Structure formats: C-alpha cells, structure tokens
Amino acid sequence: MMLSWKQLILLSFIGCLAGELLLQGPVFIKEPSNSIFPVDSEDKKITLNCEARGNPSPHYRWQLNGSDIDTSLDHRYKLNGGNLIVINPNRNWDTGSYQCFATNSLGTIVSREAKLQFAYLENFKTRMRSTVSVREGQGVVLLCGPPPHSGELSYAWVFNEYPSFVEEDSRRFVSQETGHLYIAKVEPSDVGNYTCVVTSTVTNTRVLGSPTPLVLRSDGVMGEYEPKIEVQFPETLPAAKGSTVRLECFALGNPVPQINWRRSDGMPFPNKIKLRKFNGMLEIQNFQQEDTGSYECIAENSRGKNVARGRLTYYAKPYWLQLLRDVEIAVEDSLYWECRASGKPKPSYRWLKNGDALVLEERIQIENGALTITNLNVTDSGMFQCIAENKHGLIYSSAELKVVASAPDFSRNPMKKMVQVQVGSLVILDCKPRASPRALSFWKKGDMMVREQARVSFLNDGGLKIMNVTKADAGTYTCTAENQFGKANGTTHLVVTEPTRIILAPSNMDVAVGESVILPCQVQHDPLLDIMFAWYFNGALTDFKKDGSHFEKVGGSSSGDLMIRNIQLKHSGKYVCMVQTGVDSVSSAAELIVRGSPGPPENVKVDEITDTTAQLSWTEGTDSHSPVISYAVQARTPFSVGWQSVRTVPEVIDGKTHTATVVELNPWVEYEFRIVASNKIGGGEPSLPSEKVRTEEAAPEIAPSEVSGGGGSRSELVITWDPVPEELQNGGGFGYVVAFRPLGVTTWIQTVVTSPDNPRYVFRNESIVPFSPYEVKVGVYNNKGEGPFSPVTTVFSAEEEPTVAPSHISAHSLSSSEIEVSWNTIPWKLSNGHLLGYEVRYWNNGGEEESSRKVKVAGNQTSAVLRGLKSNLAYYTAVRAYNSAGAGPFSATVNATTKKTPPSQPPGNVVWNATDTKVLLNWEQVKAMENESEVTGYKVFYRTSSQNNVHVLNTNKTSAELLLPIKEDYIIEVKATTDGGDGTSSEQIRIPRITSMDARGSTSAISNIHPLSGYMSVLLFFIVNALW
C-alpha cells in the first residue's frame, strides 16, 4: 500500500519524537476499589484512587454509572491528580459504579469498575413484643427482625440485662443468617427477657430491639419428641472460588438433638473444613471446585432423627490466563492479539480502543476473544483493552499498539565491526536494521557483489551464511538494506584464523593421598588470537584463588598445566582442560584416581549376644580406590577408657568378610562396637558405633581382693574387702558371701551382704574373746549363682583396753626443764590386743591432777622425757598402756623435782691472744646466784665463719689454748655448765685468719681485729666431748 506525502511527514515526525522522548501510552499503577462508606462517619469525604504512568503524563476523567462526572460544575467532586474526591457523600446520589479514564496523546484506558455503597443501621421500632409462653422441655424460636440497614450484620442476644449475653451451646443457637435465637429444649432457667442485639460489621454500630418475655406454661411438661430442624441451608447455594462458606443447621427436640455433618457421596471432610458452634455451623475455607456437592446435616436424639440436605455449586469470577502485552509492528503487517481468561461460567470477551468499544470492519475482526487486524496502518495505533466478563464480574487487560513506518536504520542494532572465525567453520554475518516494513538486503565483499553458491547463502532475516570458511573468505563485507522509505548500509570485517589444537593433553593418572601431580595442557594456536585456559573438575570451574592451597596453574603462555598439591580423596574425578580463543575452543579430559585409606564401614549391627560373645555384621564403606585388606573390631563400655581393641573369631578378619564374633567379653556389661577398615594405604576412619547392647548374665568369676579386718568395738569381728568392680559382677542381684570361723574350728559361719558396694561386714557376739584369731574368706554371687571365694586369711576380733597398769615406775630430773620417767612393760597376754604404746600423765606440785598434761610414746618404749617443765619444782607422774580399744588403768604415782636454772650471767671479759701457732682464751669466772645451779665447768663453742658445723670444748677452767691451722675466720662463744643445763652464752668473738706474727683482742674490742698470718690449725688442749 502506498502512503501519501502527508503520512510520510507524520511518520517522520513521530519517529523523531519517539526517539527523543520514548513515548508511552497510559498504564495504570493504581485503580479504584470497591468501597463501603459508613453514613454516620465523621470523615466527610471519600477518595477513589486512580494513578497511571505514561509519556506524556496522562490526564484523567471519571464516570458514575456510565455518565461523565463534570468536576467543574459539581463542586462536590474534586480531582487530586487522578484521584476522585467525593465531598459530603450522599447515599441517594453517590451510590453506584465508578470508572477512571486515563488519557495521553497515544490513547485512553479505562479502569475496572469500583462500586461505592453506603453502610447504615437504623434503630428498631419502639414497640412491645408479645410474651412467648412454652412448656418446659418444648423448643422455641425467638425472632429478631433487624431494622432497615445496608452492609453486613452480626447478631447476639441479651438475657434479662445488658451485657449478660446468651452463651451458645448444644441447646442454644443464634443464627447469623436470620438473627433468630433457637432454644432446642426450654428449661426453667431460661425464663426471662430476651433482647436481640444487631451490630453493623462495617460501622460497628449496635442497636437493641425490644425485650421478648419467655415464660413457662403451667399445664405440664413437654414429653420427648424427635428432632425438628428449624435452621437449615438452601437446597442450592452458589459459592465463589476462594471464599469462606458457612452452612448453619440447628434442630429443636427433647432430648436435645446432636448435630452431625457428612457429604452425601460419603467422601471424608478435608482438614480445611471446620465444625463450629457445637456443630451448628460447618465452615469451608478457600472454597474450590472439589468442595462442590451435596452436604447433609443430621439431627438425632433418642426419639429419632431428621436430615437437611443442600447442594453447594461453584462459580468463579473471570481471571486471566494470558494478558495483553504491548506490540510494536510495521505498517502493512497483520496483528493477531489474544487474551485468554477463565471463570465459571465461561467468560465472554469484548474489546475497547482508547476507552470506546472497538468498531469492527473487514480488516478488524474478533473471534473467541482474539483480535485480528490486517493491513495495518498508522491510524490503528492506540490503547487497546480486552474485557473478560461473566455474571459474577469482569476484568480488564490493557496494552499499547504501535504501528510504525520507517526507513532502515542501523543505529540501534549496528553490525559487528569485526567477526573472527577459524578455517573450516561456519559463520553468519548479521544484517538486522530497524525498518518498517522489513527491508530487503544485498551484500558486497569489497566492491564485488556476493552471490549465492554452494557455500554461501542469504538468510530470510537479511544475514549472510558462509560454510566451510577458507582464508580466501577473509575481507570486508557490506550489507545494504532498503524499503519504500529509504535505505542504509553496514559493514563487517571478517578475520579467518587457524584452528587451536592441544599438542600435549592430560592423561589418566593413579596417585595416593598426599602426593602432588601435574596435569599437562599445552596448545598450538593462531598468533593473532589471545588464548585463555580454564580447568573444570567434575563439571565445576576451578577457582584458583579459593582453592589455591591445592590447585595452581603453571607453564608458559601456550601452556595451562595444572599442578595439584597434597592430593586428597575428594580430588578424585574428571579434569577437563578448556582452551578458548576469540573464535574457537578445544578441550581435553583425564580421570584422576586418588587412592587413600578406606572410609568408615557402615551399618554396624549386633546380630546375636551371649554372656561373653557378640556376633557383629557390617557393610563395606568406600574403599577410596584401594581394596580393603582387613577389619579390626573395637569396643567401649561405661568402664573403659575410650575404645579398646577386642579379640575376635576369626582372629584376622580379611577384607571380604563382613561378620565376626567378639569373644572374652564380660557378662552383664553394656557394650558399643565399631569397625576399622585397613588397606595398603593404611587404617581408615572408624565406623559409627553400633547400638548399645548388654551381654547376658553369668555366675561371677572374680572373688573380692584385699580381704582383711580387725578393730571395731568390744565383742565384734570386723571383716573388710575391696568390692568387685561393676564390670566384673557378671549380672544383677550381685552380693557377697562372708564366711568365718575361729582359728582351729572346722565349721564355717556364713552370712550374706546384699549390697555390691558394701566393703565390710561386722559380726557381733558377746562370746567373742577379745583379740582372738579367726579364719575369714569372702565369696560372691548373683542371679545366676555363686562364684569363687577369696583365699583364707586370718583376722583378729576387736580388742579390749588393757586391764593392768605398767609396773616399777620411776622418775628422775635431767635438768631444770626435763624429767625422765621409766617403767616396765605389761605382759602381752594382759594387753587384750595389739599394744599401741603408753600414755604418761604429769602435773606439778602446785597444780591439780585434773589439769595434768599427757605425753604418748608408741610401741614398746619404756621411758619418756618430759620437757618444757618449770625449774626447781616437784612433778607427779603416772603411766598407763593403750591399744586400739582404749587405755588401761594408770600406775601408782611417782614424783621428781626439776633442778635449778643455769646461771643467767654469761662469761665476761673474754680475751684472746694469738701468736704464729696459738690462740689463748681467757674469761671471768661465772658465779651462780642462790636460786641458780652451781657452775661445774665451761663449754667453748667454735666454728669457721663459712660453716655451720660447731665444735664444743669442755673445761673446768676459765681459759683455753687453741692451734688454728685453717686460713679462715673463726667464731667463738663460751657458756657456763651446771646440773641444770648450760648458762647464758658470751658475746661472739670473731678471730680473723692469721696474717701476722702477733694479734690479740677481747669481747670489749671486737671491732679492733688484727689480721693473722700463717697456716692455721686448731689444737685442742682439752678433750672435745660434744658437738654444738
């Protein structure tokens, strides 16, 4: 079809405008929705939303019930953008269906219909309601009769006074369909006034009707009668897809009927069906087509039953299966536009263009909802809407049709500047300019026209295909495209390269865990091409940064060798080297088998258990590419430290055996078992533990150890032992058999200790002789029988305290603070046990016996030294023996007086003189005071300054002569000696090592020490009889 010059100018203008501004028809962002407005609302306006995008920006208008709303004339309506605001809404004028129209230069679209309704609830008429009189046991219905209203209501009833509401149960029911109150069987407690309460669910307004008095008749009680269904659902009830359906059913009767529900076809109810209000209501949520059918309500009591039936039918508003999409198409082409919707009943279709019904003509036809327009022209452009509707609703789908006319243009889809291919391949050179209608294309290589031949062909979309490319095909190709509105051309340079080849490919390898390998991948390629290597492991691209601890790419520019370090089992698999250039790609694969220690065996089970054996079975785990050679069994109990190897039959379990018997188990112990597999590489991870099992019981085999005893109280024989560990008790009911007899008697006395943890038994009998020997043995038993006894050992009965006192007690003073006490031991036969020692009690002349102090000596000692005593004072003392049972009687009392204290005056004016061989000491005589011991002599204490070993020289003179052969300083002290001990020490004298021929000093001039010379030795002129 030829277009006029005016159309060409218009097309040209539209094309430029479209390129600059990207024009777009209106598309709704927000559409109005159904709205219910409370009449008594404090908000005095309603806003209906409408917003669309488009370029240029759309403008808006509205219709009410198909008539335009003129906002310039009616000031109750205002536009805010696309939103319509209704001021002071009136239910008489503003109720109806609203639609929004959005328009720009490309067309108009119409919104969905939005219904505006007004909700209100008027008051009940003020009139008295008649009294309802019934017999006790009779059913009754109290009518509500709601006042005029609009909008959904809910119902309740007040009993006597507000807000005491009637509680619904199996006897009382409030219908939310009619508002009536149903009482299945009236009782005396029901007498009173009943008021219907109606609430608007929209406005939340509540109104109360007039009270209805309910009284009991006095002419008797109603007898029993079968149920009478008063509340039932319609015989046919349409239900919308996705809605919530509620069916009510309630019956009067005496006794109170029970309500049950079922489907007539016997199918069970799905979980989404709920029974509410004591079965008086059946609720189906999210109603779907499979929920249709006949439902039955059965009311039943002891007098009979009645059934109400109704059928639920399914309907669905239209919903889209296929929406319209914007179409841009060239002039003179044909359009086939399909919109598809579903619903029940099946929807019908109609089309709008720019908000008006589409006018059909020879070119424009609608069939089954699909729109066909042939021989398109620019005037067909606009906004189209498909409407699908049935009696339950309608839906809109909108799209823009752009009919374009333009000369070929490569600006939006330019040809590639260069195409690289390899020798022998196939190449397609694209030529796809934007053109309406589609352009015709022809090709040139350089200045020569390209003609079709065996290897060269032209494609329908204008492209050029060349097969089995050769080097001669390289060059510059130009495509010229032309239609009735003009022509344009584009150029592509074709580069032909040599193919890439892998000259050193990876090969299959077999390695052990921990090794490192290199998989080679070296290529030969066209030098004009850049090359890139990639490695795939089991189909996944190797990330050398993430997996750098194991994988590294090595080699030169033409090499992509893969190094794998410290190979693990997880690295087994297929490796592919992928080599890619700008024109081709090649690859080579290799299998890498990694052999390692086997994986853990699986499904470890205990098939049979006895008292000392367990039959095990398991299945083989992964062999890590190295066959399993052997298996080992390990066990664990609550008493073991970790897992322990156990003996099995067979003793060596080869890799093909998956059963074994564990032997030498302890009876009545809970065991877990696991299996460890080994191959040439080494031992693998152990299996998961088996379930815990307990071996069967057996008679005990281990006797208690460390059987001994002794001690205890008078007339007792105490026997002790180490308890048998739980893991060696071999069964439940474990205890001990204790056997004993006096030494020399043949008959055993036996008793039982039932506690397995008890380590002792005490036998009490007044006839037991103290510290008499008994033969003792301890055996074991459990539910399965008795076990062995321990070896016989001798245990002594309990001791008694000694009955005699030590004899020949004597005491004498050793010094001013010490007295020695001595005695004779008591005979063994009179000790009544093993004698532990003696206790010495003592007190001074001025003290009381009750305040005496004690000293104990162990064993058979026959003397003790009392220390820390006061000087020149008489002390009294007595001795008694003791054993483990206690102490015996004290001996007779003896006494001794401590000696006087040593002199408190130290030796004074100690003077020393030294020659080359001698040191002479002199000091003043010490005189004792009247209360001090007389001086009997003196002690000279001396040592080298570098040692603590002190030597003592006794003398009865006030002088001493020494040879000092050691080349060290000496420290010297002098003390007086008496019967009462040593006196106070003189001041220390330091004699320096001798370095000169003559030296002297004294305690009064110790600081003036002269150095001594020569080799020093000590010559003792008196007998050394003590060390200090």
From Swiss-Prot:
A Pfam family: I-set
Signal peptide: 1-19
Domain of life: Eukaryota
Single GO BP term: cell adhesion
PROSITE patterns: FN3 (PS50853), IG_LIKE (PS50835)
Positions glycosylated per UniProt: N65, N193, N377, N468, N489, N765, N860, N895, N913, N931, N956
GO cellular component terms attached to this protein's record: plasma membrane; side of membrane
Domain Ig-like C2-type: 32-117, 122-209, 227-313, 318-402, 408-497, 499-593
Domain Fibronectin type-III: 600-698, 703-800, 805-901, 902-998
Keywords, ordered alphabetically: Cell adhesion, Cell membrane, Disulfide bond, Glycoprotein, GPI-anchor, Immunoglobulin domain, Lipoprotein, Membrane, Repeat, Signal
Primary localization class, coarse: membrane
Keyword Cell membrane: yes
Residues annotated as transmembrane: none
Similarity section: Belongs to the immunoglobulin superfamily. Contactin family.
Role: Contactins mediate cell surface interactions during nervous system development. Has some neurite outgrowth-promoting activity.
Protein name: Contactin-3
Organism of provenance: Mus musculus (Mouse)
